[in-house]
Amino acid sequence: MKLDRYDLKILEILSRDGRITKSKLAEAINLSVSPCWERVRRLEKAGVIEGYGARLNTDVLVKRTPVWVQIELKAHNAESFARFEALVHDTPEVTECVAVGGGVDYLVKFEATTIDTYQRLIDEWLVSDVGIERYFTYIVTKTVKRPSASISIDDLAT
């Protein structure tokens, strides 16, 4: 899908403020409401815009202990990766997981209610058939910057 400057500007604005009104969005990109909204619908239909949501401050709702874990698997093949990734998807306390290159295979973020809860989870993973060779645990002491989905038009134009 080819994106022009209007599409890019729409994406930039919606990534910062998904609740902006149709008229304010149209005004911000210098289009009338109808063509602006048609562009938004086209971007949604094409899968460029996957949805809209609220960023929740989970610290206000429930106190959790964030823990980052570096994980290295025993075997490095498609079956081992698939088995591990299935376990990640089935563990609600895992809020983020990325496969990485370098000395480890995955970085996994757990958000458990207590360190004991995290320890029980990792112990279950270790005795399971998922094939963890070794892991390193890093307990978060302070969040310096929260992830954000907002983007700038400069990011999109490249």
From Swiss-Prot:
Keywords: Cytoplasm, DNA-binding, Transcription, Transcription regulation. It is found in: Cytoplasm. Residues 3-64 form the HTH asnC-type domain. The keyword Amino-acid biosynthesis does not apply. The keyword Lyase does not apply. GO terms for cellular component: cytosol. GO terms for molecular function: sequence-specific DNA binding. It comes from the Bacteria. It holds the Pfam family AsnC_trans_reg. One of its GO terms (biological process) is response to amino acid. Acts as a transcriptional regulator. It binds DNA specifically to a fragment from the doeA promoter region. This is Transcriptional regulatory protein DoeX. It comes from Halomonas elongata (strain ATCC 33173 / DSM 2581 / NBRC 15536 / NCIMB 2198 / 1H9). The gene is doeX.
